């Protein structure tokens, strides 16, 4: 479930057309927003901010991350992490690799 959500968050801008494969020249002479080409990075960047005539291009599409999206990712991963650490600590204690002692309060 979590990997599907992460995949959706990564691919959402690609499907919506927010990321393009480099600067392209439109029919009217405007240069579109660019993606840092050649597949090196998934982070969108904008190399051209003005048209040939000097007009400033509109703001790029902003992908908002609401609190619901953040918590829907953070809380499941925190829960899975605590389950893994709890089970690993029980495994270590079961095999006598690490057994906590209460004798540390002798100071």
Curated annotation (Swiss-Prot):
Outcome (variant: residue 60 to A/W): Abolished interaction with MCU
Side of membrane Mitochondrial intermembrane, spans: 86-107
Residues on Mitochondrial matrix side: 54-65
Main location: mitochondrion
Any one GO molecular function term: channel activator activity
Record's subcellular location: Mitochondrion inner membrane
Record-level GO cellular component terms: mitochondrial inner membrane; mitochondrial matrix; mitochondrion; nucleoplasm; uniplex complex
Ranges for region Interaction with MAIP1: 1-52
Post-translational note: Undergoes proteolytic degradation in neurons: degraded by AFG3L2 and SPG7 before SMDT1/EMRE assembly with the uniporter complex, limiting the availability of SMDT1/EMRE for MCU assembly and promoting efficient assembly of gatekeeper subunits with MCU.
Swiss-Prot/TrEMBL keywords: Calcium, Calcium transport, Ion transport, Membrane, Mitochondrion, Mitochondrion inner membrane, Transit peptide, Transmembrane, Transmembrane helix, Transport
Single GO BP term: mitochondrial calcium ion homeostasis
Pfam families per the UniProt record, alphabetical: DDDD
Subunit structure: Component of the uniplex complex, composed of MCU, EMRE/SMDT1, MICU1 and MICU2 (or MICU3) in a 4:4:1:1 stoichiometry. The number of EMRE/SMDT1 molecules is hovewer variable, ranging from 1 to 4 copies per uniplex complex, leading to uniplex complexes with distinct gatekeeping profiles. Interacts (via its C-terminal poly-Asp tail) with MCUR1; the interaction is direct. Unprocessed form interacts (via transit peptide) with MAIP1.
Function recorded in the entry: Essential regulatory subunit of the mitochondrial calcium uniporter complex (uniplex), a complex that mediates calcium uptake into mitochondria. Required to bridge the calcium-sensing proteins MICU1 with the calcium-conducting subunit MCU. Acts by mediating activation of MCU and retention of MICU1 to the MCU pore, in order to ensure tight regulation of the uniplex complex and appropriate responses to intracellular calcium signaling.
Family the entry assigns: Belongs to the SMDT1/EMRE family.
Name the record gives this protein: Essential MCU regulator, mitochondrial
Species this protein is from: Homo sapiens
């Amino acid at each position: 479930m979590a990997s599907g959500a992460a995949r959706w968050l990564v691919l959402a801008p690609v499907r919506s057309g927010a990321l393009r494969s480099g600067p392209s020249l439109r029919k009217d002479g405007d240069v579109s927003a660019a993606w840092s080409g050649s597949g090196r990075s998934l982070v969108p960047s904008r190399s051209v901010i003005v048209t040939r005539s000097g007009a400033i291009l509109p703001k790029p599409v902003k992908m908002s991350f609401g609190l619901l999206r953040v918590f829907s990712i953070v809380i499941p991963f925190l829960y899975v992490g605590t389950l893994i650490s709890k089970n690993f600590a029980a495994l270590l204690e079961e095999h006598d690799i690490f057994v906590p002692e209460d004798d540390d309060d002798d100071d």
